Amino acid sequence: MKVTCFALAAGISLFAASCSLTTMAMRSSNPEFIGKQIPGVLEKNERKLEKSPDDEALILETGSLYVMYANAFVQGPADMLPSYEFDRKEAEKSRARADYLRGVEILNAGLEKKYPGFAEAYNSGDVENMRAVMERTVKEDAAYLYWITAGSLCAYSLNPMDFALGMKIKALEVMIDRAYELDPDFNSGAIDDFYILFYASLPEGLVGDKSMIDEHFRLAVEKSGGLLAGPYISYAQSVAKPNQDYEGFKMNLEKALAIDPDKDRDNRLVNTINQRKARYLLDNIEDYFIGYGDDEWIDDDEWLDDEWLDDAWFDDEEIEFD
């Protein structure tokens, strides 16, 4: 089973206003600088949690920051490393997985404090128990549910042999569905963006209605005012690429790149990170589409066309066999 890790940078603004990075970080166009500051913030927050383990705002801030940092500043750059840096790429992905799991651990502890029994439902993956716990949640819990689900699935995507996480997928779906029920407009369509990748990445029958992918894409764009690159990249990667829809892939990535980050200054960092991803995908488009050439596509029938063969760089007379 293959699970695609989600473009979680689209949800970064959820906690930025309350954490030490604040507006300065969100309005930055320098991800490298911001990425270097986050480990220090996390270290300070961990120390604060030791003294104030029941501080709900601090729990949410720290747990979500771990998940965001792992995705946007560790795994994201690792995914774009060249193949010859395999060892470094794997090391960075291992580091990202550890950060995902630490974030989930912190958030789970926070939700267990609010709703005793949550930890048991999460750890067992029991769908009915999870539904019972979710009935007690309120709108303010949508952030917890979003980040726990996203962090868990991203960690699983980096090690699909983690059967303990794999058995939680149905329970995680219950959690994200509840988050959407509680706050469908959460963070400018972040859950709609999530659903695009969630439904597209998992096998038919394991998760909900895949026919809703296009509708969630439409809603993600609508709720973000068309100012976030994330939904276009999500659709390109999770729908166009698997369907070998070259034109759809290219079109959506170009739409992502056409967004002016200065039109939504509060999400400038988000769009800067996502647009780097879009450029990388376009620059490496030949890796994702069968039959893609530098100048043109070669249709299936053309491979056996006599005229095409005559124009090829070899002919039968030049081939010798010992």
Where is each model-derived feature located?
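Short coil/linker segments at helix-helix boundaries
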Residues: 22-47, 51-52, 65-181, 190-223, ...
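Gram-negative outer-membrane assembly/targeting C-terminal domains
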Residues: 275-277, 284-322
